[in-house]
Structure formats: structure tokens, C-alpha cells
Amino acid sequence: MSSPFVPIITADIDWRDDLPYSLQFDDIYYSAEGGINQSLYVFVEGNNLINRWQQLPTNESNVFTIAETGFGTGMNFLLTWKLWEKFAPQNARLHYISCDKHPLKKDDLIKCLQKWPELSVQTEKLIEHYPVLTPGYHHLAFSNNRITLTLMLGDVLECYEQLLFCGDINLEHQLRESYVNAWYLDGFSPSKNQSMWSDNLFTVIAMLSKESTTVATYSASSIVKTALTNAGFVINKRKGFGPKRHMICAHYEKAYSSSKKNRHTPWHINYPVTKEERTALIVGGGLAGCFIANSLAKRGWEVTILEEKEKVGCGGSANQQAVLFPKLSIYKSPFTQFMLYSFLYANDVYKELLKHYNLGELKGSLLLAHNEREKANQQSLIHWLELYPELGQLVDEKQSSELSGISLPCGGLFIPSSGWINSPELCDILIDNKRISLITGNRVQSINYNQKNWVVNDIDASVLILANGQQVNYFHETNHLPVKAIRGQMTTIQSTQESTKLKIPLCAEGHVLPALNNSHRVGASYDIGTSEPELNALDDQLNLDRLKRIAPDIIWSQNVLDHWAGIRAASPDYLPIVGPLPNALEFKEIYSELKSNSKRWIAEAAPCYPNLYVCAAFGSRGLTTIPLATEWLAGLINREISILPRKLIQAISPARFLRKKIIQGP
């Protein structure tokens, strides 16, 4: 199902006496006497954070999670970040989750944060990574992943509700291994913004909390006290900041009930399984395997990659100029949402890498309007791109020629933040970590579980991740996964004096990359169902014919210098397959009643193989979608609160195909 994307309405700010005032809520963001001192008193001291941080274990797998109901100027986040780096153990990690229905535009944010020069170091980084304000989730990493921010743009209840597994208070706590440690209830006053202080929101907050979870807010409203008490929190009154008489602190004790109408059968998640050690085996050394290895190693896990070839970055990940670009749409569906979230996150990841490594270029790419259908699709984006010009710009024939550096026959969609990345080199960089071991020439034909660890080719680990592309369904446990092989061949040709003027990737029916080492890479064929990467001259000619149609006025060399073929793995819905692997027979038995009612509440988690995960089927957009998917998966394995909403976790879940079969029949 799809519906139109509803754009975010940014904050309407009026500056009064050099202070930001919200016209939407008829309230001030902070008072003249407030700001940092108020944040320190209310939220940091109100949650006893510094003392709690100093008692944390000193390992990278430990994550302290703070959740906030209103991001506003970001000052609470920046102050927390600064204090975390000063008082928390060096290896511990902070996950800060926040939400805003009407976020500040970047210019307004800069003006607000200029008031606090003591936060200038953190402010500069936040401004650099401040996201395009599209609806949904944005995940940002700072301080080499020691600080992460999940910024959710939209209604606060809807956003936080999506962090729940099922919405049933009893089952939620049985399933949940990750909780919020401290809450900052910070929004405009209850009389101005009632949705920020609703009973329903506090019920969700309770389901994301455990007995040690604390809450702090500047408010002492009876509405807030009652809502927190009803949700299972014990209230502690404290003197308010400055002239305020009181503020509220609280700690979670026990929630008593939840709404039955908001329950969702948790078919996508399994009951927690003990992990004796923080060790992981990854089958497959392509982009997916290397990214998940990197994400786990950053969390202190010992990782071993088993790769069939002689090195990582082979097979479908061997493209030396892979193109990064989004799939933009005015319609909101699991596919378009996942593609947008993934592109924005991947772009941030690659920009950081390019500061240190010569891996490629992010100077933009051009999607040509090469036929009427593509032209109509691009024209449908006009309003969306007016709101979000950072995502793309529609250009005419003259502009496309100027942007690309060569004569082109049509206009198109210019994606300013896209470009190309050398995938094999990226794989090498990702596994350059003392916690990652690589074993090459290791073909995996079976996997075994010994009631404690997974054993593959006499190597064992507590967690097993299958990231082996089209071969992911070769095992007994995975043979129900509907993965299809798609062969693609790239052709390398000599550059000419004229063709070297090409500055950015061009994409149409095929695509061509700017010259690198006096040659262009042109591609790519798309052979569904072909699982063998044999090279053939017919595909070279197909690529050259498409190249002529992309830029017919340019004299392209017909001299084929080299060619390469890889096998993409894709799912029927072209979303990746990422998450815990269900036992197919048990799944069908437990959820058989979904056939008569797909929304039926079944109070059972998915029957999954213990600590066995899939990370595959990224198709032709792996460079775009793998970074976010693997970061989410690493967080799940490491018992962290999700950086993806439930609806997208379900959209990429390995269990979705079994559920669909139950509902629709064979």
C-alpha cells in the first residue's frame, strides 16, 4: 500500500528580544535565564546522569539510551553529548533518540545555537550532519560512532509507537532486550501542545522503559503527574529551575495495561536468546558482510568472515565504480521509505569516509529522462523537489549538458549528493579492524547449531550471519527464502579526448561513469535467473549500444579493454532480506490463523533459529541500502533500541514471505 508523502512543516520562528518564539505553539523555545543551566538542572541532574554514567561498564557493547520528546534547538542533545564525553567511560556509547513534528530549518538552528559558544564543537558537527528534513527517521553518528542520534521527524506518538515490537505491555517486556535509560520530557507546555503530554504517549514510554528508567521534565502540571502515574511511573517532586516552584522527576515501576486496539502481532521478531560470548561468524565477504562486520566490531564484537573467493569485495561487490543514488517517489510505501532513509544515511557514511580515503566521488549524478515514462516519473516530483532541493533538481537539456560536461539529448533529474564508490576498496577499509578476522577460500555448504554456538567448517561463534548473496537460500534452514539471481555485466572502454569531459555518472537505460585511469565503465546488463557470471561479447555490445543512446553526439571508443560480470541477489519485492531467520514449519503453525484475518492479534513472537540472521538480497542498490540495514542489524544483535520503525523492520524481515503465503495461500 502506498499513499502520498506528507512533507514536514518546519518550525515557524519569530525572534523576540533575540529569543526564538514558536508561532505554531505560541510559546518560547527557551527563556533568557534558561538554556544550558536549565537543561543541566532539569534533565541531566534530574535523571542523575553523571553519577549513573560513571558506574557504567567499560566496553563498547554497552549503550546508554536517552530519549527525548521534543528536539527543538538540539541544545539538550549537544549538552548531553559534551557531558558524556567528559564523564562516561571511554568505550561506552550513547544513543540519543529524539523527535520533532516541526523541526528548525538549518539557518534557524544555527542562529539558536550561536547563543552557547561553550557547545561550539558539538554544534559544528551537528550542523554539518543536520539532515534533509524529510518525514521519518534520520540516524546520525558522531565521535567515531561513540555518539549516535536518531532524529524522528513527525508526530511524537506515531514515531515512538513505531519503536515498539507489538504494543502489548506484557509481551513487549518479554521481547524487549533494549530499553530507554532516561527520558527528557521536553516540549512546549501541556496547555499549548497537548499531544506531547498525552496518556497514549506515556503508555508507549512505559513500554520502552524498565525498572531503572528515569524521567525528568520541567513541568509540574497535574496532567503530566497523572499521566505518568497511570503509565506506571512513581513521581518524585523536585524544586524547579529558577523561579519555578516544582519540576517532576520519576522512575518506572510497573505498567498495568495497554490498549488492545494498538497491538500488533510480532511475527517479525523472536524471543530473546542468550549469547554466551560476543562472537560472530559472517558467511560472505561482499559489501553486506563487510559492513555488518564493521558495525559489530565497533561494538566490541569479535568477528570472523568466511569468504569463498581469495579476497573480500568479489562477486556482486566487485564493481570499482558503483553508483550511489536514491529511488525518489512522491508516494510513501515501505519500499520508497526504506530507499530514502537508506540513501540519506549512506550519503552521510560515504562523505565521512571520503575525508580519509580516496574511494570515489560524490559530485552528483544525472538520471536522464530518456523516455516518456521516465520523464513523467520525474515530473511528478516537482512539488517534492521544491520542498527538498537537496534531494534533487529537475534540469533541462542545456542544464544537463552543463552539469555532465558533455552534450546530452535530454534533461533529467540531477541528484547533487550522489556519485560513485569503489566497492572492493571499501570492503578492504571496512574490515581493517583488529576485531575482524578473514578466512578466504572457505566454501560453506552447511551450517550447524550445537545448542550453544553455530559451527561452520569447524569454526564456531555465538551468532551466525548469512551475507552470501544469491547463495543465502542454499541451506536447509533458508531454502524457503525466495531469492533470485540477476546477472549483470559491465564493460570497460578506452576514454577519448571528448569523453574525458564527462564529470558525473549518467544513468538511463544503462549507465556510464566518468573516466578513471583513462577508461570508462559502462553497464549494465540485467539477466534475471542467470546465476553464473560467464562473460560474453553480446553483453558488451548491448552496453555500447545503450551508451550511444545516452550521449549520441559523443564519439565513444568501441575498444573494449575489459569486462566484468557479477551476480546480484534480489527478492520478489526488491527490498533486502535482513533480520532473524524464522523456522518455516513452526512459523506456519503458530500464525496459521492469519489466513482468515491478516491483522489478528496472536500473542506469540516468531519462532526463529537462535542467533541466526540473514543479510542479503540487496539487488542493484546495495551501495545505497547496505549501510543502514547492517547498522540496524548490528544494533539488534547488540540489544539496542531500533534505528528503524517497526513497519520497515517488517518490510525487510525474512519472515515476510512466510506470512504472505499464509495470508494469500500458496
UniProtKB/Swiss-Prot annotation:
The GO molecular function terms of this record are: flavin adenine dinucleotide binding; oxidoreductase activity, acting on the CH-NH group of donors; tRNA (5-methylaminomethyl-2-thiouridylate)(34)-methyltransferase activity
Q: Where is this region: FAD-dependent cmnm(5)s(2)U34 oxidoreductase?
A: 283-666
Q: Where is this region: tRNA (mnm(5)s(2)U34)-methyltransferase?
A: 1-253
Entry keyword annotation includes Mitochondrion: no
Name the cofactor(s) required for activity, per the record. Answer: FAD
Among the GO biological process terms of this entry, one is: tRNA wobble base modification
Known SUPFAM superfamilies for this protein?
FAD-linked reductases, C-terminal domain (SSF54373), FAD/NAD(P)-binding domain (SSF51905)
Give the GO cellular component terms, alphabetically. cytoplasm
Query: Catalyzes what?
Result: 5-aminomethyl-2-thiouridine(34) in tRNA + S-adenosyl-L-methionine = 5-methylaminomethyl-2-thiouridine(34) in tRNA + S-adenosyl-L-homocysteine + H(+)
Question: What's the domain of life for this entry?
Answer: Bacteria
Family of this protein: In the N-terminal section; belongs to the methyltransferase superfamily. tRNA (mnm(5)s(2)U34)-methyltransferase family.
**What does the protein in this record do?**
Catalyzes the last two steps in the biosynthesis of 5-methylaminomethyl-2-thiouridine (mnm(5)s(2)U) at the wobble position (U34) in tRNA. Catalyzes the FAD-dependent demodification of cmnm(5)s(2)U34 to nm(5)s(2)U34, followed by the transfer of a methyl group from S-adenosyl-L-methionine to nm(5)s(2)U34, to form mnm(5)s(2)U34.
Per its record, how is this protein called by name? tRNA 5-methylaminomethyl-2-thiouridine biosynthesis bifunctional protein MnmC
Instruction: Tell me which species this is from.
Output: Legionella pneumophila (strain Lens)
> Source gene?
mnmC
